[in-house]
């Protein structure tokens, strides 16, 4: 996913009528940048996904792809630079400063905006994570440029402008947004929306160190400690290989046990559509779709889910989608690979039993070995 153009994209003639001449101060902005998000010294996977997408955009534009790294001096920051090259970057802009050890909006915004003003990128991409959303908004505001959030598709049009597609009107429509008269063109993309690129053995390229300083007394926010939010019960749907999800077709909260049993049987995780969270049947971290988690599993089983646009954009990156619904005209059958027109409540126990029987010999073999 990430290359599909929305029907909402205006024709070239309509865009031409909206487009003014790019102001003189923006005409030398070039290249594609990806902000590399570090989590306690480790690169967030969404950064690699964005490097893959950024590589494609840079090749279309005939420009370079740069990874942007803000962090403290040390091996973890240099390792992040090496990883940027392995996932497609041509060069890395590096700001090493002890004040950037932990994320705080003020120093990160100042460092990134200084980099942009100095080196003038045409496109700047960030992950739509908690950190990325906070940083992207403040950087765009500081630079007086546009920002398209939570994109499901990125492309370059015939004029070389970034076409950023995202759902709108509660997920019922897709729109394509352009930043025509400001630079850089900024967009955020959630984890797992873009495909993870293949890691290469590309040698380390050019690293440009940017000398940047800020005084601690100029920063309002102070870090007093770090408490991990690594709770074992939290859903990790975004990176699960197998996901089973339920919707309103399950009829009541008790029937959620059916998707949990199936997920447990086939070694997967479970989730739900937005209406079930709104009803209080499942917590928000189990929601799948544009306003929840975006998933890209090898197998996705949707039970009793109609498949509205906001759900579709969160799941259509799956390798195999199996849809179970009583309505043969449900939108989910338009993009599912396998469709079963039946009552999910009756079908799920039979499916779980079939998987149990099929997997039993393999399970016994693993125990013996």
From Swiss-Prot:
UniProt KW Heme keyword: no
Record InterPro entries: DHS-like_NAD/FAD-binding_dom, ETF_a/b_N, ETF_a/FixB, ETF_alpha_N, ETF_asu_C, ETF_asu_C_CS, Rossmann-like_a/b/a_fold
Translocase recorded as keyword: no
Record GO terms (molecular function): electron transfer activity; flavin adenine dinucleotide binding
Region (Disordered): 1-20
One Pfam assignment: ETF_alpha
Assigned keywords, A-Z: Electron transport, FAD, Flavoprotein, Nitrogen fixation, Plasmid, Transport
Annotated binding of FAD, by residue: 299-327
GO BP terms in the entry: fatty acid beta-oxidation using acyl-CoA dehydrogenase; nitrogen fixation
Known partners and oligomeric status: FixA and FixB form a heterodimer.
Protein family (similarity comment): Belongs to the ETF alpha-subunit/FixB family.
Function: May play a role in a redox process involved in nitrogen fixation.
Designated name of the protein: Protein FixB
């Amino acid at each position: 996913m990430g290359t599909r153009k929305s029907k909402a994209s205006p024709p070239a003639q309509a865009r031409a009528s909206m487009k003014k001449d790019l102001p003189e101060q923006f005409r030398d902005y070039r290249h594609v940048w990806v902000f590399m998000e570090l989590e306690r010294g480790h690169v967030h996977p969404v950064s690699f996904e964005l490097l893959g997408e950024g590589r494609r955009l840079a090749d279309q534009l005939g420009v370079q792809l740069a990874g942007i790294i803000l962090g403290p001096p040390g091996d973890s920051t240099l390792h992040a630079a090496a990883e940027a090259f392995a996932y497609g970057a041509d060069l890395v802009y590096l700001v090493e400063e002890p004040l950037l050890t932990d994320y705080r909006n003020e120093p990160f915004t100042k460092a990134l905006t200084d980099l942009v003003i100095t080196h003038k990128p045409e496109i700047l991409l960030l992950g739509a994570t908690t950190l990325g959303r906070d940083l992207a908004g403040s950087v765009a505001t500081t630079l007086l440029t546009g920002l398209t959030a939570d994109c499901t598709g990125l492309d370059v049009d015939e004029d070389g402008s970034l076409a950023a597609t995202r759902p709108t009107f509660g997920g019922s429509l897709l729109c394509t947004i352009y930043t025509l008269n400001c630079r850089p063109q900024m967009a955020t993309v959630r984890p797992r929306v873009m495909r993870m690129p293949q890691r290469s053995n590309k040698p380390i390229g050019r690293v440009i160190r940017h000398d940047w300083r800020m005084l601690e007394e100029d920063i309002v926010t102070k870090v007093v400690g770090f408490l991990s939010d690594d709770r074992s019960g939290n859903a990790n749907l975004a990176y699960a290989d197998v996901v089973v999800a339920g919707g309103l077709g399950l009829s009541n909260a008790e029937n959620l046990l059916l998707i949990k049993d199936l997920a447990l049987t086939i070694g997967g995780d479970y989730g739900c559509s937005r209406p079930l969270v709104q009803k209080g049947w499942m917590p928000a971290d189990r929601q799948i779709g544009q306003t929840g988690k975006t998933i890209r599993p090898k197998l996705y089983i949707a039970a009793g889910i109609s498949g509205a646009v906001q759900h579709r954009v969160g799941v259509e990156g799956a390798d195999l989608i199996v849809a179970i619904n009583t309505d043969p005209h449900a939108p989910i059958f338009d993009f599912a690979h396998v469709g079963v027109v039946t009552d999910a409540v009756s079908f799920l126990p039979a499916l779980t039993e079939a998987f149990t029987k099929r997997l039993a010999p393999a399970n016994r073999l693993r125990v013996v070995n």
